[in-house]
A protein has these predicted regions:
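Helix-loop interface residues and adjacent transmembrane-helix termini in multi-pass membrane transporters
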Residues: 25-28, 36-39, 73-76, 151-152, ...
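Interfacial/gating helices of multi-pass transporter permease domains
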Residues: 34-53, 119-124, 188-193
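Alpha-helical transmembrane segments of multi-pass membrane transporters/permeases
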Residues: 93, 148-175, 189-196
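Small-residue-rich hydrophobic transmembrane alpha-helices
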Residues: 42-105, 139-158
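Transmembrane alpha-helix boundary and packing residues in multipass membrane permease domains
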Residues: 16, 20, 31-32, 68, ...
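Residue-level signal for short hydrophobic patches within transmembrane helices
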Residues: 6-25, 29, 51-58, 134, ...
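Alpha-helical transmembrane segments of multipass membrane proteins
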Residues: 28-32, 102, 144-148, 167, ...
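Short alpha-helical transmembrane segments in multi-pass integral membrane proteins
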Residues: 1-13, 70-137, 168, 183-211
Length: 211
């Protein structure tokens, strides 16, 4: 019995541990590709990514709430109301990510300039965050669906989604940052573009699977 219990726990948690590592995977792969672009770009990328992740964590908190609520309703046999929970969470998440997006675009530039000692790094960081900010909408909605599937104990699909995001991000980084396969070389701005598109792909994958 113990052996079966441990195996069942591992079957659920192993994909979960890897699947919720999405933002780290995206950031690490971006960092590998931009590492050849110089110190200014590396500094702007690191600080810009930190600013983005700080805002993203607000959205992550709502996704954790969805996970708990869905698991509670599923365990209580109230599955009919789980759909309403998911829908309401997605609407609220849309407003939250929109608010964070507005704050980022209205105050982000002033904050970056005020905190940066180098004007070159500040400008590169501003260019980065203006593109990366759009990813908040996709990443936030993706996390809601991740929380939903975790609450139901269906973690394998989360792992598939994470792998899809990682593969897409690596491929798009290869295309956009250095301008391969006929694409223009976007440099630093290619990284946030690749990340945002990859997060959109991950969200659409889970949405289609849900439907």
């Amino acid at each position: 019995m113990q052996k079966y219990t441990y195996r069942a726990i591992l079957k659920i948690t192993a994909p979960l541990m890897l699947g919720t590592f999405v933002q780290s995977i995206v950031t690490i792969t971006d960092a590998v590709f931009v590492s050849e672009l110089g110190d200014i770009v590396i500094g702007a990328f690191g600080n810009g990514s930190l600013m983005y992740i700080s805002l993203f964590m607000f959205c992550r908190g709502l996704a954790d709430g969805v996970q708990i609520t869905v698991a509670n309703k599923d365990g209580a046999g109230a599955r009919a109301s789980i759909g309403d929970t998911l829908f309401n969470a997605q609407i609220f998440q849309l407003f939250l990510s929109g608010l964070l997006f507005a704050i980022l675009f209205i105050f982000g530039e002033a904050v970056i300039i005020g905190l940066s000692e180098s004007s070159d790094v500040a400008q590169a960081m501003i260019d980065f965050i203006k593109v990366r900010g759009w990813g908040l909408f996709f990443a936030a909605q993706h996390m809601i669906l991740v929380g939903f599937f975790i609450g139901l104990g269906r973690t394998n699909i989360i792992l598939v989604s994470a792998l899809l995001i990682a593969v897409c991000n690596i491929f798009l980084d290869y295309l956009f940052i250095h301008g391969n396969m006929g694409m223009p070389a976007l440099g630093l701005q290619g990284a946030p573009l690749a990340s945002s598109i990859s997060e959109l792909v991950g969200f659409l994958f889970l949405l289609i699977y849900l439907i």
